[in-house]
Curated annotation (Swiss-Prot):
This is Na(+)/H(+) antiporter NhaB. Its main location: membrane. It is a multi-pass membrane protein. The keyword Ion transport applies. GO terms for cellular component: plasma membrane. GO terms for molecular function: sodium:proton antiporter activity. The gene is nhaB. The chain crosses the membrane at residues 28-50, 68-88, 98-118, 121-141, 145-165, 205-225, 244-264, 301-318, 350-370, 394-414, 449-469, 477-497. Keywords: Antiport, Cell inner membrane, Cell membrane, Ion transport, Membrane, Sodium, Sodium transport, Transmembrane, Transmembrane helix, Transport. It comes from Pseudomonas paraeruginosa (strain DSM 24068 / PA7). The keyword Metal-binding does not apply. It catalyses: 2 Na(+)(in) + 3 H(+)(out) = 2 Na(+)(out) + 3 H(+)(in). Na(+)/H(+) antiporter that extrudes sodium in exchange for external protons.
C-alpha cells in the first residue's frame, strides 16, 4: 500500500477527530478480542460498556454513532450478543424509535408557534431565577403528560433558533445563505464576551429543562416509557400510578424546583448566567420584526400549529395510539394545512432525530450484550436476597447506578420482571410488591440524571445540534447535573426507604 493512500485512510478514519481519539478507538477494537480470549465474555462485556460510555463522553470530538457503531459491530462478531438479541431489543423499544422518527419531526413543524411562545416568555420575564424556575416547572408539567423526548425536542428547537438569531447578527451575516452558526470566526471581539455569556445562559436553561423532564416524567403512567411497563406489570391505571408514586415523586419535585432556585441564586455548577442586554435587544428586535412581517397566511399557519398542538396533547393524554404515530398525525395535519408539500422541505424536519435514532440502535446493541451476558443478574439476586425492609432502598440505589450506565427502560424491565416472578411464586405480599414497584420506577427515573446516557432525553440533548453551539459537553452535563443528582437521588432514596 502506498504511503499517500495509507495517509488518506488514516485521515478518512473518523474524519476530523483528534489523532489520539482515533488511536484510542483502534486500541479498543484491537484489544477486545484479546480480552475476550484471556478474561472471558463477562469481563469483555463490562469493558465494552465502558468503551461505549467513553464514546458518549467524547461526543463533541466525534459523533458517537461511528465509534460506538464499530464497537457494537465487533461485539456482535465476537458473539457477545447475537443479531437476534439486538432485533428483539429493537422490537421491544420500537415505540421509542417511532417517537424519534416522527414526533421530533412533528415538533419541527410547530417551531414557529413554539418560538413565538418561548420568545415572549424569555423576553417578558426579566428575572433569570424566575425564568429558570418556569422552564424547569413547564418541562416537568409537560413531561408528566407528554414524553420527555418530545419536551426536550421543543426546548432544543427554541434554543437553536434563539442562538442562530443572535449569532447571525453578531457575526454580521444577516442575509448570508451559507451562514454557519457553529463557527465564531466571523464574530468580532466586541461581541464575543456577550456570545459566551449567552451560551452559558442557554446551557443553564437547557439543563434546568432537561432535569424538569425527569422530575415530571417520574410522576405519571405516560411520563416515561418504563412507567408504562411498570404500571402494566403492577396493574395500575393512570390515577392509581400517580397515587402510588406520589409519596416519593411529589417531595422530590418540590426539592428539585428549590434546587433550581438555589443554583441560580448561588451561581454554582455553571448556573446563574444572565441574558446580556445587547443580546436581549437583538432578540427583541427580531421578535418585533417577525411580528410586523406576520401576514394573514402566517397567522393562519400559527393557528393550524396551535390546533395541531391541541390534537397532540389530547391524543397523548388519552393514549389513542403510540406516541410516534401521533407525531406522524401532527406532521400530516400541519404540512397539509400550511402548504408544505416540497419533499426537500419536509426532509429537513427529520435531520435532527434520525442520527440519534441510529445511535439509539447502537445503544440497544450494548443493552443486548448486557442482557445476553447477564451482567446485572448478580446485582439483582443480591438485592432480592436482602431482608424485606431493606429491599426498597437497595433496589432504588441499584436501579439508579445501573440506569446511569445503561438504558433505564432495560433496567426497569429486568427488575420488574424478577420482582413480578417473586410475587407470582408467593415469595412476597402484594403490598411489598407495590412498594418495590415504586422503588424500581423512581430508581430508574431520578438518580439516572447523573449521566447523559442515563436518560434518553439527556442523551438526545448531548447529541443534538444545540450541544456544540453552546459548548455543552458530556463532562459539563455531568457537572451541571451533579447537584440535582444528589438532591433527587438522596431524597428519593430516603422517601423510598421511610415514607412508603
Amino acid at each position: 500500500m502506498s504511503s499517500p493512500l495509507s495517509q488518506a485512510f488514516a485521515q478518512n478514519f473518523l474524519g476530523h477527530s483528534p489523532r489520539w481519539y482515533k488511536l484510542t478507538i483502534l486500541a479498543f477494537l484491537l484489544s477486545n478480542p484479546l480480552l475476550l480470549w484471556l478474561a472471558g465474555p463477562t469481563v469483555a462485556a463490562w469493558v465494552l460498556v465502558g468503551e461505549f460510555i467513553f464514546t458518549l463522553a467524547m461526543a463533541l470530538k466525534c459523533y458517537p454513532l461511528q465509534p460506538g457503531g464499530l464497537l457494537v459491530l465487533e461485539a456482535l462478531l465476537l458473539g457477545l450478543a447475537s443479531p437476534e438479541a439486538l432485533y428483539a431489543e429493537l422490537q421491544h423499544n420500537f415505540p421509542v424509535l417511532l417517537l424519534l422518527m416522527f414526533m421530533v419531526a412533528g415538533i419541527y413543524f410547530m417551531k414557529d408557534l413554539l418560538l413565538l411562545l418561548f420568545s415572549r416568555l424569555l423576553l417578558g420575564v426579566r428575572s433569570k431565577t424566575l425564568l429558570s424556575l418556569l422552564f424547569c416547572l413547564l418541562a416537568a408539567l409537560l413531561s408528566a403528560f407528554l414524553d420527555a423526548l418530545t419536551v426536550t425536542a421543543v426546548v432544543i428547537s427554541v434554543a437553536v433558533a434563539f442562538f442562530a438569531v443572535y449569532h447571525r447578527v453578531a457575526s454580521g451575516q444577516r442575509a448570508s445563505e451559507d451562514y454557519d452558526p457553529a463557527t465564531d470566526r466571523q464574530v468580532p471581539e466586541l461581541h464575543r464576551a456577550h456570545l459566551e455569556e449567552f451560551r452559558a445562559f442557554l446551557r443553564s436553561l437547557l439543563m434546568h429543562a432537561a432535569v424538569g423532564t425527569a422530575l415530571g416524567g417520574v410522576c405519571t403512567l405516560v411520563g416515561e416509557p418504563q412507567n408504562l411497563l411498570i404500571g402494566h406489570e403492577a396493574g395500575w391505571h393512570f390515577v392509581e400510578f400517580f397515587r402510588q408514586v406520589a409519596p416519593v415523586s411529589m417531595p422530590v419535585l418540590a426539592a428539585g424546583l428549590l434546587t433550581c432556585v438555589a443554583l441560580e441564586k448561588s451561581r454554582r455548577f455553571g448556573y446563574g448566567a444572565q441574558l446580556p442586554a445587547a443580546v436581549r435587544q437583538v432578540l427583541a428586535e427580531y421578535a418585533a420584526g417577525e411580528s410586523r412581517k406576520r401576514g394573514p397566511q402566517q397567522k393562519a399557519a400559527l393557528l393550524v400549529q396551535a390546533l395541531a398542538a391541541l390534537v397532540l396533547m389530547i391524543g397523548l393524554a388519552l393514549h389513542v395510539a403510540e406516541v410516534g404515530l401521533i407525531g406522524l398525525l401532527v406532521i400530516v395535519l400541519i404540512t397539509a394545512f400550511t402548504g408544505i408539500t416540497d419533499e426537500h422541505q419536509i426532509g429537513r424536519a427529520f435531520q435532527e432525530a434520525l442520527p440519534f435514532t441510529a445511535l439509539l440502535v447502537a445503544f440497544f446493541a450494548v443493552v443486548a450484550v448486557i442482557h445476553q451476558q447477564h451482567l446485572f443478574t448478580p446485582i439483582i439476586q443480591a438485592v432480592l436476597a436482602l431482608p424485606a425492609e431493606r429491599q426498597p432502598g437497595m433496589l432504588f440505589i441499584a436501579n439508579g447506578l445501573l440506569s446511569a450506565i445503561s438504558d433505564n427502560v432495560f433496567v426497569a424491565t429486568i427488575y420488574i420482571t424478577e420482582v413480578k416472578q417473586a410475587l407470582d411464586a408467593g415469595h412476597m405480599t402484594r403490598e411489598h410488591f407495590d412498594t418495590l414497584a415504586v422503588a424500581i420506577n423512581t430508581g430508574t427515573n431520578l438518580p439516572s440524571v447523573a449521566t447523559p446516557n442515563g436518560q434518553a432525553a439527556f442523551l438526545f440533548l448531548l447529541t443534538s445540534s444545540i450541544a456544540p453551539l453552546v459548548r455543552l459537553s458530556y463532562g459539563r452535563m455531568v457537572w451541571m447535573a451533579l447537584p440535582y443528582t444528589l438532591v433527587m437521588g438522596g431524597l428519593g432514596w430516603w422517601a423510598v426507604s421511610h415514607w412508603l
